[in-house]
């Protein structure tokens, strides 16, 4: 798919902006704090319904204004899709796809598929399991709305169960109905995540071999908190979760929260058999994340039938010239958006192969 046009009104430091994009490569170039990432963020917003930098939509609206408007036109193989987001400081945001208002956020997913790679993504290797769960969940949600709804349901049930445990410490509580529902939704989460990791691990391994010239072997391993076998069916997984919830009930009661279940899942990255988080060099960690992101491109292509768009925010300067070259020259079928402060990135790119946008204080020169 291709983002053909972007229109912004009162979005961050943009008052009014209309841009038409190149089908292959688009470069946003400029000094720090001019509005390069804001452009990437606005495109991402039309894909995910929220920013990747903040959970507060208010921050996206220009400081001196009360409303903001974002519109992208996406060209797909079989159709054109218009996505509109209206942000309002006094009420919830309005989303429209092809002029039809959306009732739930889940309806937006899948209209525009994006893969974002920014320096923040290093957290995926460096930080705790919640970053890796977020990665799995965001990526599965963009290819399966059923997963997205099951996850929201699971989180709601979990909140209820935790409240019950927290406010009834030392008292008898009837938790079984909640356990039943939690296990039913949780079992599906495990099935989806297991399936996703199975696919992405194969693609990431291939990708990593390619970028490291076969020197390194990357493994991506799913680590569910409730131990399940590779071929366990959903009913079996549900029983296993129920069993775990029962066994941990006294601990849960003491601590006032649910200590087992898919909300504690993790994913491990290994290079040549060693955990990248503990043993990987800075460069290896970066390359592992890059391989994972490039694997996502292929995974979405396989699931959706077209490549997603690729958003690269501030990552060029962090990659060596070989990897930079790969991103700029090898992804011929993927529309790519790059932010950079250096002209260097553009050298040996033919003018007809890209569009360059000089970003200066919320204006494009
Ligand atoms: N709600 C807002 N209203 C007005 N201006 C805003 C708003 N939010 C952010 N900005 C301005 O946007 C600018 C930052 O934009 P952005 O993050 O896109 O910079 P950048 O060009 O990517 O910079 P860098 O190279 O440092 O990453 C800042 O100057 C900031 O003051
Ligand atoms: Mg930036």
From Swiss-Prot:
It holds the Pfam family SMC_N. Keywords: ATP-binding, Cytoplasm, DNA damage, DNA repair, DNA replication, DNA-binding, Nucleotide-binding, SOS response. Its main location: cytoplasm. Disulfide bonds: none annotated. GO terms for molecular function: ATP binding; single-stranded DNA binding. ATP binds at residues 30-37. Transmembrane segments: none annotated. GO terms for cellular component: cytoplasm. GO terms for biological process: DNA replication; DNA synthesis involved in DNA repair; double-strand break repair; SOS response. SUPFAM superfamilies: P-loop containing nucleoside triphosphate hydrolases. Belongs to the RecF family. This is DNA replication and repair protein RecF. It comes from Alkaliphilus oremlandii (strain OhILAs).
